[in-house]
Amino acid sequence: VVVMAGLAGWFAAGYIGTIVPLWANLALLVLIYATVYATSMIYASLKTVARWHHPLTPACYLMFAAAGGLLATLALLAILGLPITAALAQAAIVLMLSAWGVKFAWWRVASAARQAGSIESATGLAGMGAVRPLMPPHTEENYLQHEMGFVVARKHATTLRRIAVLLGGVVPVMLLFVAPASAVVLMLAVLVHVTGMFVERWLFFAEAKHVVSL
């Protein structure tokens, strides 16, 4: 979304005849990706969520930002009637496939991630065997329990992953192959991609396990 908003402003400037200097273009790109990276580190820096605490988390954010941003760029070029080169369309396909390749690697790493803490380590009784709490360490439900203790059945998570990949990657790539210069097709590709990314984002949060759920 940040990348798309930045691109929209860039195109708007060009559309009204404003010449954007090279340094301004580079500065815009740096600020956009710095924002994306900073956002990703909000999650990657949390040791309390093992699935997120990995270098591939910001890599996923940056790759999807690049892939979605270029796809949106192609759609805007087509809408404005500007030429779309084969190299741009091919780059969009490569970026999209690469982004999902990184995401598959993230899923594999996340599935193997284990919480750094346990009830035994939290109580300091790890050397005395298994520990079973008599009562919860809180008196009422809290935000973390609602937002970071969500349980998604494995079969549902697998289905949602397939939907995310299909809508967020496969369909947009197919549309790019079919009509890389059609405004209607490219707008559809952007819409489908964003829908798939919403599913991917929901899974990102729904599958996360905070140590509060021990």
Each model region followed by its residue ranges:
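General detector of N-terminal leader/presequence modules that precede the first folded domain
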Residues: V1-M4
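Active/binding-pocket-proximal capping segment
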Residues: A122, H210-L214
